[in-house]
């Protein structure tokens, strides 16, 4: 059996076309969604991610502002800049690119962003709303995964969903969204005793551990849907996910590639959250 490839680039393109229409409706009312992206330091991967986000904003008509600061910048300077953006009516969303330099607390910085402009969905207020089933902004990667599953017609009601990875950014919010969709959810972490056994139970397997090849084909139920959230570099420099694609694709019913799977959806949902923030501000 050869798994169907779940094309995140194609699904994200459809979402961007829909967002263009929503932006056009806002522009007709003299409103243009705006996103501020703050980058501290010179992490090469972060610079690539920021460029991709800015290009995506331009594609759908979102006004974006990128502010780059040296790694020597202090946390208080960053917090002051965030506070000033709260009062800017042209900015609907504020994104601080992670990771931050070691001398800065990501928690304090994220909590300094107004929940109304927290388009990453990381603020504790937005996490709490997600927990209660009434999200204001859904974290972009889990949101993108849900949209991918929806685009493939995957039924989650009653399905066994297993998540490998329990981070605040992906694993935990992913569990909340799957629960809301009616799935029975298991989260595996670094202390899970029988990862392979847990993974084999999954009708839908979502892998977000940050470790290349942590899941291979022997750990997958035949016909399962496999979503690979990981992004790593192989020893020869190639991008690869957390799933060993070659062996997994022989067993799974459908699988996301890396790159071209979840990544484009994460950016698309950032745009969606920014447009949503602009629409709310216009009410």
Swiss-Prot record:
The record's listing under InterPro entries reads:
Aminoacid_DH-like_N_sf, NAD(P)-bd_dom_sf, THF_DH/CycHdrlase, THF_DH/CycHdrlase_cat_dom, THF_DH/CycHdrlase_CS, THF_DH/CycHdrlase_NAD-bd_dom
Recorded catalytic reaction(s): these are:
(6R)-5,10-methylene-5,6,7,8-tetrahydrofolate + NADP(+) = (6R)-5,10-methenyltetrahydrofolate + NADPH; (6R)-5,10-methenyltetrahydrofolate + H2O = (6R)-10-formyltetrahydrofolate + H(+)
Q: Which UniProt keywords apply?
A: Amino-acid biosynthesis, Histidine biosynthesis, Hydrolase, Methionine biosynthesis, Multifunctional enzyme, NADP, One-carbon metabolism, Oxidoreductase, Purine biosynthesis
Where along this sequence does the record place binding of NADP(+)? 165-167, 190, 231
Q: Does the keyword Amino-acid biosynthesis apply?
A: yes
Q: Name one GO molecular function term.
A: methylenetetrahydrofolate dehydrogenase (NADP+) activity
What is the annotated role of this protein in its UniProt record? Catalyzes the oxidation of 5,10-methylenetetrahydrofolate to 5,10-methenyltetrahydrofolate and then the hydrolysis of 5,10-methenyltetrahydrofolate to 10-formyltetrahydrofolate.
Name of protein: Bifunctional protein FolD 2
């Amino acid at each position: 059996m050869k798994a169907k490839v779940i094309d995140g680039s194609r699904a994200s393109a459809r979402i961007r076309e829909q967002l263009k229409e929503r932006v056009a409706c806002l522009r007709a009312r003299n409103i243009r969604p705006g996103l501020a992206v703050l980058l501290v330091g010179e992490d090469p991967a972060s610079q690539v991610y920021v460029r991709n986000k800015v290009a995506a904003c331009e594609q759908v008509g979102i006004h974006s502002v990128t502010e780059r600061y040296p790694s020597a910048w202090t946390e208080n300077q960053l917090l002051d800049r965030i506070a000033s953006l709260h009062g800017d009516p042209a900015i609907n969303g504020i994104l601080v690119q992670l990771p931050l330099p070691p001398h800065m607390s990501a928690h304090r910085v994220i909590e300094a962003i107004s929940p109304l402009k927290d388009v990453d969905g990381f603020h504790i207020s937005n996490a709490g709303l997600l927990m209660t089933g009434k999200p204001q902004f859904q974290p972009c990667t889990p949101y993108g995964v849900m949209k991918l599953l929806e685009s493939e017609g995957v039924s989650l009601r009653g399905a066994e969903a297993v998540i490998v990875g329990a981070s605040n950014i992906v694993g935990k919010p992913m569990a909340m969204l799957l629960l809301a969709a009616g799935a029975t959810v298991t989260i595996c972490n670094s202390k899970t005793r029988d990862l392979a056994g847990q993974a084999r139970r999954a009708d839908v397997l979502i892998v977000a551990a940050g470790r290349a090849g942590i899941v291979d084909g022997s750990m997958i139920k035949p016909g399962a849907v496999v979503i690979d959230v990981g992004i790593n570099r192989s020893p020869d420099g190639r991008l690869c996910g957390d799933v060993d694609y070659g062996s997994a694709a022989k067993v799974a019913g459908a699988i996301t590639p890396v790159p071209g799977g979840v990544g484009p959806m994460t950016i698309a949902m950032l745009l969606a959250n920014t447009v949503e923030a602009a629409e709310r501000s216009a009410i």
